[in-house]
A protein has these predicted regions:
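Intrinsic-disorder-associated interaction segments
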Residues: 4, 38, 42-49, 96, ...
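Amphipathic protein-protein interaction modules
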Residues: 62-118
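Short, positively charged and aromatic/hydrophobic N-terminal segments
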Residues: 1-19
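Secondary-structure transition/turn motif
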Residues: 12, 41-43, 82-88
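Hydrophobic, Leu/Ile/Phe/Ala-enriched alpha-helical segments that form helix-helix packing faces
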Residues: 1, 15, 52-61, 115-121
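Intrinsically disordered, low-complexity segments enriched in polar/charged residues with Gly/Pro
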Residues: 13, 55-58, 89, 96
Length: 121
């Protein structure tokens, strides 16, 4: 389940770099290609967690549009990043921010668990 718009390249690049200096992509979804990607470094996650991540990412991009990535910062904090093509007039910046805050509230326990998993990994 790869998509061609650069997320795979970004993911491969992040896994090659020193994780103490750069973010590591956990997963992402792209509304333009209608694809989802999970970093293979995290294939040991339980299937239920992987499925929840997929649903969350795809749901966001279907609702808001653009590209959503979940990334670990060097300190282990999990962040959500959203971007859109410059010519995507349907993408809603304000709606994206509101939806991200909603997801952060609703998925707080999942995010905390993933941060802990990443730190001990």
């Amino acid at each position: 389940m790869l998509y061609e718009t650069g997320l795979v390249a970004k993911l491969e690049e992040s896994t090659k770099r020193n994780t103490m200096e750069q973010n590591v992509v956990l997963c992402g979804a792209n509304s333009y290609d209608q694809k989802y990607y999970l970093n293979q470094e995290f294939s040991a996650l339980p299937d239920a967690v992987k499925q929840e991540l997929q649903i969350m990412c795809v749901w966001f991009t279907e609702d808001i549009g653009g590209i959503l990535t979940l990334e670990f910062e060097p300190d282990g904090t999990l962040i959500m990043k959203t971007t859109a093509d410059d010519m995507d007039y349907y993408y809603d910046d304000i709606g994206a921010g509101l939806k991200l805050h909603q997801l952060q509230r609703q998925k707080r326990e999942l995010m905390s668990s993933l941060e802990m998993y990443y730190r001990v990994m």
